[in-house]
Amino acid sequence: MMISEDISEPSSPDTPFDDSDLLNSSMTDDVSAQLAASGPIGVRAAAAIATGKKRKRPHSFETNPSIRRRQQTRLIRKLKATIDEYATRVGQQAVVLTCTPGKHDGNFKVFGAAPLENIMRNLKGIVLQDLDNALAQRAPQPSNENSDLYELPPLVIDGIPTSVNKMTQAQLRAFIPLMLKYSTGRGKPGWGKESCRPVWWPSDLPWANVRSDVRSEDEKRKVSWTHALVTIVINCYKHHGRDDLLPEFIEDKCKEIEASQNQVASLPTATLLPSHAVVHTINNPDGTVSLIQVDTGATVATLADVTQVQQLTNLQTLQQVRLQPLQIQHALGNQQAEATQAVQTLAEVAAAQGGDGELTEGQTVTTLPEGTQLVLASDGSLQAINDGTAQGIVIPASVYQTVVAGDGQPIQIANVNIAQQSGGGTTMAAIKNAVMQSQPIPSQVATLVVNAASHDQHT
């Protein structure tokens, strides 16, 4: 026995569906408008989208054909499981019917409870014909505004307008020969004949069948074949002034803008740190990480994610430390200004020497053994460290900087201030408030080159 109220009950009782204004209500949507103007298959898709939007479903049409195909497979599998559960739990005859009008086979698929499944499959011809007629009555009329423009094929995949940047390599290889027929007016492209080569064909691509990539290995590494095929299509449409046939959906642009904004927002304090700043990381009790600038001791930023520290400071592994010769001058005045000027001079010397300079007369070379540590201090003096377990030197953080030598390798440079004692010798002054310590230098030797003020001084 059949319940009478179930015969014509709409699928959504609160919002009864009325197809009289099916497509007009969605013309304000850029995606639906382009779909409706592309032909019968696009009209079918636009009508389905309008149905979902009228019922307030929080979904949008997937413009990428590859992703759309994966979504179709996933949802069909879910529908089959749902219809089987419905038939088992409720005990009613129920089927799921999907079709694509306009294609040669209609892509007619039906599955569910028997015998209703077999009945619907036998009605395939009637269903497709009635559906084509219903969509044709509501499809927008084609406009003749572009009658004087050059005729080129629309970029459609399975009847759906598709952006050229989202077409797969196989789709591009199949589409370009069709595009050439419209562009050149010839039945065959004439591959390999320079006389048949279109003027818009990229000069750096060979005039050969696009089904195979005949470029050299170097050219293949520089530009992918898919990107080269996209360039061919864009050049053709721009040459003939048919940019209007290159579909670009507003939703895709919004997604790209949102993705770029999220990428920038992930590093909100990146511009707060100068490129030469030396920072010290402190793990706070609440799980955040604070960045302390060594020069001032002030907190630059506090990050919730410890992985952002590497992105902000751009830390590099210290494989080799080379300190270039620097003429030390003793003068009264602003010590910070002198240190800054000295660092700039040292950077110029390092760049000119290509990173490997020769020692000159009056220079003393000190070689630090394996396990030596370089310690940055907040003042401008130098001191040796030997606590029995490790040896090292202290370098003032105010003059610590990294430059790139001529060979492209990073060079750690420092301005070493030598304090002259009353006894005529030169010693390393005591260091206070050391705020940063680098990692030990494994299997490497750090060389410190210092210019002595006179022949009777020592380091």
Curated annotation (Swiss-Prot):
Keyword Ion transport belongs to the record: no
Family the entry assigns: Belongs to the NRF1/Ewg family.
Region described as Disordered: 1-25
Keywords: DNA-binding, Nucleus, Transcription, Transcription regulation
Pfam families associated with the record: Nrf1_activ_bdg, Nrf1_DNA-bind
InterPro entries assigned: NRF1/Ewg, Nrf1_NLS/DNA-bd_dimer
Function: Transcriptional regulator that interacts with specific sites in the control region of the cyIIIa actin gene. Also binds specifically to similar target sites located in the regulatory region of the SM50 gene.
Signal peptide: none
Main localization, broad class: nucleus
Protein name: DNA-binding protein P3A2
BP terms from Gene Ontology: regulation of transcription by RNA polymerase II
Highest taxon listed in the record's lineage: Eukaryota
A single GO cellular-component term on record: nucleus
Places the protein is found: Nucleus
One function term, GO molecular function aspect: RNA polymerase II cis-regulatory region sequence-specific DNA binding
